[in-house]
């Protein structure tokens, strides 16, 4: 008998002459007389065989166990169009599936069994692969992770131990230098005190003797003592006035340590809750600069913008700008993205910085009111009050960080990515300070 009743597997349709006549399906086999066998169990168990999904025994005939609810005949065919089992009448001429693609239910079930077998084999292979991965790869990874973790712990302990020893040694050295400087200043002060105490006694003696001459000698005696009076006056004039000397002051440079500064800056940057939210004051932006809407980016424009230069806060010539943030006490940090610019200045300035004119008094770093780190092409320097200190950098920083400690009087420029200190300026800043910026090439922006 052909496998398709109405059309081939590829979906071609056939005419009414190819529709099979319904044939009686074999009914269920008569029950056999019970014979001797094992005692009945608690319930029906699965028949012995290869197991679920592994096919049937060779020669085992497919027997439909359900009847068509419409015709009462066995569901021995499968409609591929409606994806459901049907009887021969449904599949035959005039049936609801007459024009559909159909095949024997037995063949379709066998195909499904084969697919299940394939899936089971794939699942078995997948399970074997996962089992091997868990047993071999993960176990090896776990052992390697433990070894690496132990080695990393050892490295951390060794490095921190070395840092700790170095810090203790540096602490001892600096404390000894501070103590020595204190002793030196103290001895200088004691020496000066003894010197001036002696001079005071001598001056008192001269004054007392001259007062005694004035009160006890007559005119003739005074004339006779004229030479002695002149000598005593000359001796008094030889005692000079006290002069200010740095030797009498404690030299703070004795405590300057690149190592301590580096560690301190790194520690401070790591402990700060966050950078200052610095915003640029739009009233101060020079005519060659464009300010972004978020007030954090300055773009150089060789064409002067049509801005009102009458504002007393605005720079009317140089491409400068001040921030709205004012710092007078405490510790402050912020960073600027400078990777796109080859000509910029970043630093701090006081409110006394002149704004009008093209003179040097308005240029950042050329007056007493601004302290800036500047770059021009491949040259870097720190500038203040017309003094320009060249800085030798190994590479051009993409970001420039600033750390301002007003209590200690320190302005530190550093590279945020590595924490490398680029320059330190120490000074007792007299006024409120504002972050200040200048750009003459492309763009710089404050890091949020």
Curated annotation (Swiss-Prot):
Pfam families from the UniProt entry: PRY (PF13765), SPRY (PF00622)
Coiled coil: none
Low complexity: bias regions: 1-18
GO MF term set: ubiquitin protein ligase activity; zinc ion binding
GO cellular component: cell leading edge; cytoplasm; membrane; perinuclear region of cytoplasm
Bias (Pro residues) ranges: 19-51
B30.2/SPRY domain location: 257-448
UniProt keyword terms in alphabetical order: Calcium, Calcium transport, Cytoplasm, Ion transport, Membrane, Metal-binding, Transport, Zinc, Zinc-finger
PANTHER family: E3 UBIQUITIN-PROTEIN LIGASE TRIM
Function: May regulate epithelial calcium transport by inhibiting TRPV5 activity.
Protein name: B box and SPRY domain-containing protein
UniProt gene name: Bspry
